[in-house]
Amino acid sequence: MSTDLCPVYAPFFGVMGCTAAIVFASFGAAYGTAKAGVGISAMGVLRPDLIVKNTIPVVMAGIIAIYGLVVSVLISGNLKQILSLYSGFIQLGAGLSVGLAGLAAGFAIGIVGDAGVRGTAQQPRLFVAMILILIFAEVLGLYGLIVALLLNTRATDNVTC
């Protein structure tokens, strides 16, 4: 039964939030992995002994996709055939917040990781600075995860259809 508060299209927004969370976060993780991986490959030609040590940017980029996966699973757990428009919009906002924050974080991790591993091959003291900058880039994705989790907890508060 469709009402003004619970139209038939309301679950669509929840599904789009679920999709946005995993798709955008995965795009960011893929870009970060690819960009940092190219830097590691180029650096590995001259300094193959540093390859394992410099895989940290690739690992950090992969963590961004996990943020999107967590929110996607949480949103999909709350999806129902009859859903309020409020819940659908909240779920869309949660998915977009973690997805777009993950996209930005993945771009930052990829660019910093690429330049960082290339620089570390020339000057090993740059490694600590690279790690610090990568942590700040990773936190951007974590902010999106926190906002998405807070939004998702509000999606089912006192909502009736």
Curated annotation (Swiss-Prot):
One of its GO terms (biological process) is proton transmembrane transport. Coiled coil: none annotated. The record marks E138 as: Essential for proton translocation. Its main location: membrane. Residues 33-54, 114-125 are cytoplasmic. It comes from the Eukaryota. It is found in: Vacuole membrane. It is a multi-pass membrane protein. Residues 1-9, 76-91, 152-161 are lumenal. The chain crosses the membrane at residues 10-32, 55-75, 92-113, 126-151. One of its GO terms (cellular component) is vacuolar proton-transporting V-type ATPase, V0 domain. Keywords: Hydrogen ion transport, Ion transport, Membrane, Transmembrane, Transmembrane helix, Transport, Vacuole. One of its GO terms (molecular function) is proton-transporting ATPase activity, rotational mechanism. V-ATPase is a heteromultimeric enzyme composed of a peripheral catalytic V1 complex (components A to H) attached to an integral membrane V0 proton pore complex (components: a, c, c', c'', d, e, f and VOA1). The decameric c-ring forms the proton-conducting pore, and is composed of eight proteolipid subunits c, one subunit c' and one subunit c''. Proton-conducting pore forming subunit of the V0 complex of vacuolar(H+)-ATPase (V-ATPase), a multisubunit enzyme composed of a peripheral complex (V1) that hydrolyzes ATP and a membrane integral complex (V0) that translocates protons. V-ATPase is responsible for acidifying and maintaining the pH of intracellular compartments. PANTHER family: V-TYPE PROTON ATPASE PROTEOLIPID SUBUNIT. Belongs to the V-ATPase proteolipid subunit family. NCBIfam families: V_ATP_synt_C (TIGR01100). This is V-type proton ATPase subunit c. It comes from Schizosaccharomyces pombe (strain 972 / ATCC 24843). The gene is vma3.
